[in-house]
């Protein structure tokens, strides 16, 4: 996260650190057995850390899990990595609530333009060079209207399944290593860090987020056992 500060150790109990090997991502624990992230973070081998704050110093209640099952949209365009950028991971074993682990509820309402949103992750803190912090960083940004979002990504398919968030003056943004992490707007889990401009935190391109609310039927169907459910078009 560019332009943020170290997260409070107690404000990200749902934040998962995904370590696929060559790079890393984040995810969000949505119940004791499921983590929600983005499809472009998928790799063959992956470790999932829960209850993590300082990467070099484990918490007493830190847990490590592995994917038992991974679900991406069956109607996703495989030739276009940014299409339907969402993935559900079923953990090999459930986790229990603890001082540093607790799930985040899915949203009950869609996001609204202008909302103040909170983003977090272990991604680089510098837009010009890879500077990965030992602790997650948090920042506040705003949900941007669709007209501005489409204008920033002219020619790219910015759909109703995505939205933009950032700050108009630049300088605060998600970046490399933050993919898959949550965007929490007005207390609700509304977005998943997906992708952005070639240079983070630079105008006029706020980052793009997968809109969780649009995928609620798919998420709920998969968790309920309907593993052939399709995503919205």
Swiss-Prot record:
PROSITE patterns: TRYPSIN_DOM, TRYPSIN_SER. Gene3D superfamilies: Trypsin-like serine proteases (2.40.10.10). One of its GO terms (molecular function) is serine-type endopeptidase activity. GO terms for cellular component: extracellular region; secretory granule. The keyword Transferase does not apply. Residues 1-224 form the Peptidase S1 domain. Its EC number is 3.4.21.-. Snake venom serine protease that may act in the hemostasis system of the prey. This is Snake venom serine protease BthaTL. It comes from Bothrops alternatus.
């Amino acid at each position: 996260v560019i332009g943020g500060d170290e997260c409070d150790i107690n404000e990200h109990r749902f934040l998962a650190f995904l370590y696929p090997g060559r790079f890393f991502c984040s995810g969000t624990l949505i119940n004791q057995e499921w983590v929600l992230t983005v499809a472009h973070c998928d790799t063959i081998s992956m470790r999932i850390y829960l209850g993590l704050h300082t990467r070099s110093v484990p918490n007493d209640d830190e847990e490590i899990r592995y994917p038992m099952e991974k679900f991406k949209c069956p109607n996703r365009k495989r030739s276009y990595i940014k299409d339907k950028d969402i993935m559900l991971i079923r953990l090999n074993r459930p986790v229990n609530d603890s001082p540093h682990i607790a799930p985040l509820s899915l949203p009950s309402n869609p996001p609204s333009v202008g909302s103040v949103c909170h983003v977090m992750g272990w991604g680089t803190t510098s837009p010009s060079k890879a500077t990965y912090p030992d602790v997650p960083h948090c920042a506040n940004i705003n949900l941007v209207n669709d007209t501005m979002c489409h204008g920033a990504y002219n020619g790219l398919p910015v759909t109703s399944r995505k939205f933009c968030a950032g700050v108009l003056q630049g300088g605060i943004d998600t970046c490399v290593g933050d993919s898959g992490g949550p965007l929490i707007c007005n207390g609700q889990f509304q977005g998943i860090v997906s992708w952005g401009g070639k240079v983070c935190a630079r105008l006029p391109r706020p980052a793009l987020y997968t809109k969780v609310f649009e995928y609620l039927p798919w998420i709920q169907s998969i968790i309920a056992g309907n593993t052939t459910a399709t995503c919205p078009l």
